[in-house]
Amino acid sequence: MKGIRWSVIILLILIFAVTALPKKLVYGYVTPGPDTWYRKDVEGFLYAAELAGVEVVVLNSDYDVEKEISNIKTLVDMGVDGMCIFSFNPNGPFIAAREAAKAGIPLVVTDNVGQVLEAEDPVVAAIDFDWDAMGRDIAQYIANQWPEENIAFIAGRLEHVPVQVFLKAFEEEVKKLGKNKIVAIRDGKYIPDEAVKQVQDLIESGYDFTVLHIFNEEMAAAVVRWLKSRNLLNNPIKITSQNGAPYGIELIKEGSIKYSISSSPGWEGFISFLALHGYVTDKIKKERQWILLPITPVTKETINDKTKVVPWDVDPVWIDLTKKYFPQYMGLLDVLK
């Protein structure tokens, strides 16, 4: 009888010990599609989550509005402790903000250029690069390097808010500088073959341009190959691009892409996690934060410097850069001490 009593006591102690353990946090991430930029953003988020011991549920919307709404509601129904959304359309973040607020789930929004901060429902933070500054920087470079030459522009997805902000700034700066003219704007949809198709159509339709800006280097790499095959690359068509992707860096080194801007989606995902985690763990209580990651031109002087041309893939330099640019996150992870 005494043995049974002790067994019951031990069992109760074990049950209490298990229930007293801190609950493992679970975050949700809604990603817009399968493209490299989005995958790297997710990888950065997951890397930080692994360091923090947080579980993450990732749901892909595959550029489908209804699927995106379903993904948001799925995470809400799961009762996740926090949520991040990277949307391909302007309405997605506002829907996520509304649904998350109703459920009391903290929300971080990636690459919405801060628009969601104006929503009635509060969000923790909007994480962005300065797309306006990027557009103006590219316009200034083209004006300085190739005055009087016409420009064709291959966008990512024209419904994507960062594309719209970049393009508006680019058009305004080109007009302000008065040295170049934009003769065509086409939607490459972030699909390399589609970008090639659009460039081919522009050339065969007789558009007069010698400068081609392509919204990411994945599309630019495909266009480079196509132009090379027709002896048109730098003869006379010059390419500028953006993002500082690994394959883009190599094309810049060989002169196939003349200019680009570094913006690492991997590090962006890492910072998105820290913004969410800081709020969920009560380290940072502020809401409606607009957090901008730094951008830098990719030049011969910066191309081999990871602190300037920030890697897309998981890299220890993210830790150093976070300590430098975002000291508010010190102590959130063991590596940030």
Spans of features found by a protein language model:
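Periplasmic-binding protein-like
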Residues: G28-Y29, G79-S87, P106-T110, A152-F153, ...
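Hinge/cleft segment of the Venus flytrap/periplasmic-binding protein
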Residues: L158, E173-V174, I271-K337
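Flexible loop/hinge segments that line or gate small-molecule binding clefts
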Residues: N91-A133, N144, G156, A245-K253, ...
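Extracytoplasmic "Venus flytrap"
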Residues: L25-G44, A48, A52, V56-I69, ...
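Hydrophobic alpha-helical segments within soluble ligand-binding/sensing domains
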Residues: E68, A125-I151, E194-V196, N243-G248, ...
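Structural motif
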Residues: V57-G79, A184-G206, A220-A222
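Flexible loop/turn connectors
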Residues: N235-T299
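Hydrophobic alpha-helical
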Residues: I85-K102, F170, G188-L251
